[in-house]
């Protein structure tokens, strides 16, 4: 316990002194204000606590699958239809929890387009099955932004066993999500989250890779399409090869429409057919070497 720092509460009275396990997540100033990690507080008598207001706005919805398409070899874009007349009042950078029932799913039933099947066949991934005996819940960040109304959009990477340990069980929730087809029902709850942009004029630097695209897309679309922000911002995205890039037309359009926004992609394993002349390597290194190292005040940026 105490490792994720997500269960913050404000203790008004009771609970004893803050524990060393909490100090990685809570500053001395926050501790003086009563901030604690709920999982680390021993309840031995009556206490007075204050919970974040957004917790009381959490609801549950049964959604319908609009589409569930591959955007990369191991990433699907799941689009869910919110029930008519309902809204999920999330902020960019937020997440929902998705529920999956007990199931037995065969990877051989997955719909994987021909262009992405090479690696699936190479690593014999269609042999796997996901067997789950109880309901499960997992969290996923929204890829859409608040003004893409009526939907929830997720980028979900299938959690296959690693090549050096092929006998471990595959990811339970990602297997369920990859099995979903148009018209299927899916239950979500939310919204949750604290990964929100600050209301300042500081430069924004977004960095992500793979399915980490989701909150980056949500944030950037929200800044440029809803808020019409004039803040200087850049997006640095990492993918294995050109085939693993997605949403590039969207970001190209945003860059063309907004002179304050640029985006870059680095490929860690470009293929000969890619004819790639852009950045190569891991995106965090590319960001440092080609931008932050010579930036006049990287500490003033918001990441």
UniProtKB/Swiss-Prot annotation:
- Any one GO MF annotation of this record: oxidoreductase activity, acting on NAD(P)H, quinone or similar compound as acceptor
Instruction: Give Gene Ontology CC terms.
Output: plasma membrane
The record's catalysed reaction(s) read: a ubiquinone + n Na(+)(in) + NADH + H(+) = a ubiquinol + n Na(+)(out) + NAD(+)
Where in the numbering of this chain does the 2Fe-2S ferredoxin-type domain appear? 1-55
Record localization: Cell inner membrane
Every copy of the FAD-binding FR-type domain together lies at: 58-198
* Cofactor details (free text): Binds 1 [2Fe-2S] cluster.
Positions with a binding annotation for [2Fe-2S] cluster: 4, 7, 39
- What sections of the sequence does the record tag as coiled-coil? none
Q: Per the record, which residues fall in region Catalytic?
A: 201-303
Q: Does the keyword Methyltransferase apply?
A: no
Question: What domain of life does the native source organism fall in?
Answer: Bacteria
Q: Which cofactor does it need?
A: [2Fe-2S] cluster; FAD
Instruction: Report the family membership.
Output: Belongs to the NqrF family.
**Function in brief:** NQR complex catalyzes the reduction of ubiquinone-1 to ubiquinol by two successive reactions, coupled with the transport of Na(+) ions from the cytoplasm to the periplasm. The first step is catalyzed by NqrF, which accepts electrons from NADH and reduces ubiquinone-1 to ubisemiquinone by a one-electron transfer pathway.
Q: What is this protein called?
A: Na(+)-translocating NADH-quinone reductase subunit F
Annotated source species: Photobacterium phosphoreum
């Amino acid at each position: 316990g105490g490792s994720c720092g997500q269960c913050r509460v404000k203790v008004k009275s009771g609970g004893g002194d803050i524990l060393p396990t909490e100090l990685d997540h809570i500053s001395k100033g926050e501790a003086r204000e009563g901030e604690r990690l709920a999982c680390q507080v021993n309840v031995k008598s009556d206490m007075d606590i204050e919970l974040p207001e957004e917790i009381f706005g959490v609801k549950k919805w049964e959604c319908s699958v609009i589409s569930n398409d591959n955007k990369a070899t191991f990433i699907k874009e799941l689009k869910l239809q919110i029930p008519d007349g309902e809204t999920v009042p999330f902020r960019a950078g937020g997440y929902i929890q998705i529920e999956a029932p007990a199931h037995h799913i065969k990877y051989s039933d997955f719909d994987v387009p021909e262009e992405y099947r090479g690696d699936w066949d190479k690593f014999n991934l269609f042999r796997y099955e996901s067997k789950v005996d109880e309901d499960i819940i997992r969290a996923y960040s929204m890829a859409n932004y608040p003004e893409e109304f009526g939907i929830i959009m997720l980028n979900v990477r299938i959690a296959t066993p690693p090549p050096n340990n092929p006998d471990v069980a595959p990811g339970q929730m990602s297997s369920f999500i990859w099995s979903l087809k148009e018209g299927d029902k899916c239950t979500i709850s939310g919204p949750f989250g604290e990964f929100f942009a600050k209301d300042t004029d500081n430069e924004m630097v977004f960095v992500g890779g793979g399915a980490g695209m989701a909150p980056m897309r949500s944030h950037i679309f929200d800044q440029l399409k809803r808020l019409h922000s004039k803040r200087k911002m850049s997006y640095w995205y990492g993918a294995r090869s050109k085939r693993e890039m997605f949403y590039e037309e969207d970001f190209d359009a945003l860059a063309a429409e907004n002179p304050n926004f640029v985006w870059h992609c680095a490929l860690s394993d470009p293929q000969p057919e890619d004819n790639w002349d852009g950045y190569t390597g891991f995106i965090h290194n590319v960001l440092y070497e080609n931008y932050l190292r010579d930036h006049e005040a990287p500490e003033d940026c918001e990441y």
